[in-house]
Curated annotation (Swiss-Prot):
This is tRNA dimethylallyltransferase. The record marks 100, 121 as: Interaction with substrate tRNA. Its cofactor is Mg(2+). Keywords: ATP-binding, Magnesium, Nucleotide-binding, Transferase, tRNA processing. Monomer. It comes from Corynebacterium glutamicum (strain R). Catalyzes the transfer of a dimethylallyl group onto the adenine at position 37 in tRNAs that read codons beginning with uridine, leading to the formation of N6-(dimethylallyl)adenosine (i(6)A).
Length: 301
């Protein structure tokens, strides 16, 4: 039976390159698990591989949402599970590539999403309108520090959703998620790229500089014409949020660059914390030869 391979780890650690290498070795197809690469036109700012960089490897779950659409982990899960099972039915190996934590978990684990209640949600949305997202996120931190650690403090939708789940279940939001010691769906093997700040931080700064040099601002300007706004899932993405703020005169371009770098580093710390808690991950050194190490772990070298 074909076994999917998941490639996880922090931003700028080389997941896409490792995914391509494994797909070549294993006759695989890539399923994207980066939430922002799901959006059409969000290319430069998400380091989405170009068609040429995909080296003839089929990719799924890229460019499937308009920037006006609200992200949905449940929708992604349904669509991506169908992709994985289709790839397996054709005798090919699904290579799941991405670092979006909840999206990875929704795919690798059989996550049954908790209930919703429109009245409870409306109450928290009213609270959000009254005190603002950062103050509401602070309340989430008091109730459930682990959930707050993986939800950005400028993300109103996920903050409200976490509070709704906590009230409805009487448990922390994290308790609604599958345990990280359960067998992964399909027996998926999870390969993680291990990095150090000393190695990764310069790569983050270099990548951010390259984004701006390659036309990131023009990309955002084009997406604004397609309906991108600051108060949306896509508009809150790291980098896009800062460019939109600079375009609106709310910060300088120098600040936009620096805040993109610091925002990415902050996100990387959350990714490290999240994936380090998952003992099913087999780690390879991102600064060495991760492909050879991964193949050895998989018993293929």
């Amino acid at each position: 039976m074909v076994t999917p391979i998941a490639v996880v780890g922090p931003t700028a650690s080389g997941k896409s390159a490792l995914g391509i290498a494994l797909a070549h070795k294993l006759d695989g197809e890539v399923v994207n698990v980066d939430s922002m690469q799901l959006y059409k036109g969000m290319d430069i700012g998400t380091a989405k591989l170009t068609v040429e960089e995909r080296e003839g490897i089929a990719h799924h779950q890229l460019d499937v949402w308009d920037v006006t659409e609200t992200a949905s982990v449940a929708r992604f899960q349904s669509d991506a599970v169908a992709d994985v099972e289709d790839i397996m039915s054709r005798g090919k190996t699904p290579i799941l590539v991405g670092g979006s934590m909840l999206y990875v978990q929704s795919l690798v684990d059989d996550w049954q999403f908790p209930p919703t209640d429109s009245a409870v949600r409306a109450r928290f949305e009213a609270r959000l309108a009254d005190i603002g997202v950062e103050a509401l996120h602070a309340e989430l931190t008091q109730l459930d520090p682990e959930a707050a650690a993986v939800i950005e403090n400028n993300d109103p939708r996920r903050t409200v959703r976490a509070l709704e789940v906590i009230e409805l279940t009487g448990q922390p939001f994290q308790a609604s998620q599958p345990p990280k010691d359960a067998p992964p769906r399909w027996g998926t093997r999870i390969i993680g790229l291990k990095t150090t700040p000393e190695w990764l931080n310069p790569r983050i700064e270099q990548r951010t500089a390259m984004m701006f040099e390659q036309g990131f601002v023009a990309e955002v300007e084009h997406l604004v014409q397609q309906g991108l706004i600051a108060d949306s899932t896509a508009g809150r993405a790291i980098g896009y949020s800062q460019v939109l703020a600079a375009m609106a005169g709310e910060m300088t371009w120098e600040d936009a660059f620096e805040r993109t770098v610091t925002g990415t580093r902050r996100y990387v710390r959350r990714q490290r914390s999240w994936f380090n808690r998952d003992h099913r991950v087999s780690w390879v050194d991102a600064s060495g030869d991760p492909t050879a190490q991964a193949l050895e772990i998989l018993g293929l070298q």
